[in-house]
């Protein structure tokens, strides 16, 4: 059984930003879709997991941007599961222009037994015989972001909409970065030379939830907190 899943693709206009480049939130969605395709091949896709009362949970994601491809540009996508721990899984991603690495990413997952409300051991999930021959596409650790920011400024609000909700009944993973980046003017995003984005998922959100966004900036780093009242639901770091 092959550890790596690869495919050729064209960057779709729906995933591009105001500059005609693959957007930051579009990258998260592209990698999530790629992981979903590979999960089907491995027998751990949504339908197969639902039959076992299991559901994939995204814990955290880091994406490193060396360059971003343009609208309709031909790229090569690759993803693979890393050797799992007892309860946590990591998956790597790469996006290349020919042999040139443009974007690399890594996501930590867990599997929830929806009937029992407990995490499922990795030995009960991944197919037997899968060779874990490839390490991580990202050498840096996931960001460690404080759950509370001292003297942080609230700068935006976002109400979770019906279009944000997925089949699990809560806000889709790809909707969080979309809401996050949409809270900034395009001019400010253009002025930032964003090279790395970390997302740390803390709590599920539901349609109608009012989320407040806070920010705290230091040299080259912008930390963000998304909260529902006092509860932190998402932490993010944009690094230049």
Residues covered by each model-derived region:
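Hot-dog-fold acyl-thioester-processing enzymes
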Residues: 1-58, 106, 113-195
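HotDog/MaoC-like acyl-thioester-processing domains
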Residues: 2-7, 62-66, 70-148, 201-207, ...
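A conserved acidic, glycine/proline-rich C-terminal tail/linker
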Residues: 187-216
């Amino acid at each position: 059984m092959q550890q790596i899943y690869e495919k050729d693709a064209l960057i779709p206009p729906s995933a591009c930003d105001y500059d005609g480049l693959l957007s930051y939130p579009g990258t998260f969605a592209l990698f999530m879709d790629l992981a979903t395709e590979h999960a089907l091949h491995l027998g751990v896709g949504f339908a197969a997991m639902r039959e076992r009362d299991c559901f994939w949970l995204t814990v955290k994601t880091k994406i490193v941007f060396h360059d971003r491809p343009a609208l309709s540009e031909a790229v090569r996508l690759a993803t693979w599961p890393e050797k799992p721990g007892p309860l946590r899984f990591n998956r790597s991603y790469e996006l290349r222009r020919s042999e040139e690495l443009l974007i690399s990413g890594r996501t930590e997952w867990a599997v929830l037994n929806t009937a029992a409300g407990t995490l499922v051991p990795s030995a009960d999930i991944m197919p037997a015989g899968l060779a874990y021959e490839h390490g991580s596409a990202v050498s840096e650790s996931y960001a460690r972001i404080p759950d509370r920011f001292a003297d942080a400024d609230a700068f935006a609000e976002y109400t979770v909409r019906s279009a944000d909700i997925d089949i699990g009944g809560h806000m889709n993973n790809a909707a969080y970065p979309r809401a996050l980046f949409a809270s900034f003017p395009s001019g400010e995003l253009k002025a930032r030379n964003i090279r790395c984005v970390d997302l740390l998922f803390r709590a599920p959100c539901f349609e109608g939830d009012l989320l407040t966004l806070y920010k705290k900036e230091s040299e080259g780093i912008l930390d963000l907190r998304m909260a529902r009242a006092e509860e932190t639901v998402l932490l993010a770091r944009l690094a230049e």
